[in-house]
């Protein structure tokens, strides 16, 4: 089942964050350091208290996946329409649980949550080379919104 993460989940989430880091490190070792996480325990505990940054976990007796989200709103902008967006900052399914629909359950829960709080859309970023993630998001109905380009000097 999917639920909002609590402080009890911090250790399991940290382990999943290590898996995410290694996926990114393998794809882009020039950008991502190996064997680290983007949050430590204290930062993660603090993040769990921020209502604008909900974190959800898939839990079947143990945490098998997570979704880090960020809710943003644009209002009264000169150029942009008023829009409320749920950005998926990070989604991970434990290596041991892949292919068991954990990712689908997490994504659908986040989608339903976004609808329930009045979001107009869901966005996320996928690193070039992360083909399994790209395929998964396309299967969930997501489409390319924009493309970021780079040249390595």
Give the predicted meaning of each segment.
Residues 57, 62-71, 87, 92:
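Conserved beta-strand in the GNAT
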Residues 42-57, 87:
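A short helix-loop-beta-strand connector motif used in the catalytic cores of GNAT acetyltransferases and
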Residues 104, 108, 116, 128-146:
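Conserved active-site alpha-helix within GNAT-family acetyltransferase domains
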Residues 1-15, 24:
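A short beta-loop-alpha structural element at the N-terminal edge
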Residues 114-125:
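Conserved GNAT acetyl-CoA-binding A-motif
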Residues 123-133, 150-153:
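Conserved beta-strand-loop-alpha-helix junction that forms the acyl-donor binding cleft
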Residues 22-44:
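Conserved GNAT-fold acetyl-CoA-binding loop/helix
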Residues 90-93, 99-112, 139:
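Conserved acetyl-CoA-binding loop-helix of GNAT-fold acetyltransferases
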């Amino acid at each position: 089942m999917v639920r909002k993460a609590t402080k009890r989940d911090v250790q399991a989430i940290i382990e999943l964050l290590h898996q995410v880091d290694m996926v990114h490190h393998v794809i882009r070792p020039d950008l991502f350091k190996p064997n680290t996480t983007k949050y430590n325990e204290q930062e993660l505990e603090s993040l769990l208290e921020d209502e604008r940054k909900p974190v959800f976990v898939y839990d079947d007796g143990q945490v098998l996946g997570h979704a880090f989200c960020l809710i943003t709103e644009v209002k009264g902008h000169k150029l942009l329409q008023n829009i409320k967006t749920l950005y998926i900052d990070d989604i991970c399914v434990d290596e041991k649980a892949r292919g068991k629909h954990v990712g689908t359950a997490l994504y659908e829960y986040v989608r339903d949550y976004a609808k329930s709080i009045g979001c107009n859309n869901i966005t996320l970023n996928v690193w070039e080379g992360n083909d399994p993630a790209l395929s998964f998001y396309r299967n969930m109905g997501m489409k390319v919104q924009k493309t970021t380009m780079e040249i390595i000097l």
